[in-house]
């Protein structure tokens, strides 16, 4: 895969906006694409962090093949989106870190209802979680200039 791609300020602002979900595409063992809607975090270094309960198909796919893509649509304008091609550069099984990641994501996605976020975090603590850090290698956006 190519070297890491830089994210311009428009793309960074779009990805950092609250309430956006990503569709993560991975590759099944037979080569078929697999998609899942996920919470994500744009990290300060321009990488993306995603988190899941371990044992699901898409985390297994990323453990086997680090290539992935994320499509992040604008919820209000179906024509506005950012598509990212990337590769996992770090798999985090450390439960202290993975649980902190999912807690931060829950609080971000439920900032308007922190009671709900805390209920989710309590449930997530009963699960073995895994985080993936994705380095972006290509960016395609369809955003207004």
Where are the regions a protein language model picked out?
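Amphipathic coiled-coil/heptad-repeat helices and related helical stalk/stem segments
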Residues: 7-8, 55, 117
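Short beta-strand segments
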Residues: 19-54, 62, 68-72, 81-83
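Charged, gly/pro-rich active-site loop segments
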Residues: 1-3, 80-145
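Short, basic/aromatic recognition patches
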Residues: 1-23
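Alpha-helix boundary recognition
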Residues: 15-16, 63-64, 125
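Alpha-helix boundary/capping residues
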Residues: 18, 65-66, 105, 109
